[in-house]
C-alpha cells in the first residue's frame, strides 16, 4: 500500500505536545524519520508540505484511492465543507470529494457546536465518512494504546485495509469477554 502524508504546522505542534514526537519542518526529513520508524519500503511513504500545490493529491488527474484527515480540527472541517482550500490538506480533501473518492474525517473537538454538527452533516451528505475518535470499551482495553488501536482499526476498516489491531466483535476473544 502506498501512503501520502500531508501534515500541517499545527500537526507538528500537536505531535510534540501530545506524543513527544518532533516532526521536522522539511517534508523530506519527516519522510526519512517516519520511513525509518515504520520500516516503510522505498516508495511506500511520500510526505508533502502544506503548500506543495503541485503535489499529486492536489490534482484530480492523480487523486489517491482514499484520504483520511486525522485528527481534523473544526477549522479544517469547516473549510472542507465549504470547498475552501488554503492548505494542501484542504485541497486534497476537495479533490477527493470532487473525484468521488473515499474521504474519512476524524473530528478532534468535543463537545460539538451546532455549527460543527451542520458542517459534519453537510460533509456526510456529500458521502464523507465522519468518524469521531470515540473508542469502544467492549474489548476491555488495558492501555491508552488499546483505545487508539480501536479508532485506528475503525479507520482502516473504512479504507478496506486488513489489520489485526484488535479482535472483531463476535470473534472468540470478543465472545469470551462478553460472557464474563
Please provide the spans of the model-predicted regions.
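A cross-family phosphate/adenosyl-ligand binding-site feature
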Residues: 1-104, 111-180
Amino acid at each position: 500500500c502506498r501512503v501520502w502524508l500531508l501534515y500541517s504546522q499545527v500537526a507538528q505542534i500537536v505531535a510534540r505536545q501530545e506524543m513527544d514526537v518532533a516532526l521536522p519542518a522539511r517534508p523530506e526529513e519527516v519522510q526519512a524519520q517516519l520511513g525509518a520508524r515504520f520500516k516503510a519500503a522505498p516508495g511506500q511513504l511520500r510526505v508533502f508540505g502544506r503548500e506543495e500545490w503541485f503535489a499529486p493529491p492536489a490534482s484530480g488527474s492523480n487523486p489517491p484511492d482514499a484520504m483520511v484527515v486525522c485528527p481534523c480540527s473544526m477549522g479544517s472541517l469547516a473549510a472542507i465543507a465549504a470547498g475552501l482550500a488554503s492548505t494542501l490538506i484542504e485541497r486534497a480533501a476537495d479533490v477527493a470529494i470532487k473525484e468521488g473518492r473515499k474521504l474519512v474525517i476524524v473530528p478532534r473537538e468535543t463537545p460539538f457546536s451546532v455549527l460543527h454538527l451542520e458542517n459534519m452533516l453537510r460533509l456526510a451528505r456529500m458521502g464523507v465518512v465522519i468518524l469521531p475518535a470515540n473508542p469502544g470499551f467492549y474489548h476491555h482495553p488495558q492501555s491508552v494504546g488499546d483505545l487508539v488501536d480501536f479508532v485506528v482499526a475503525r479507520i482502516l476498516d473504512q479504507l478496506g485495509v486488513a489489520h489485526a489491531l484488535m479482535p472483531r466483535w463476535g470473534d472468540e476473544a470478543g465472545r469470551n469477554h462478553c460472557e464474563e
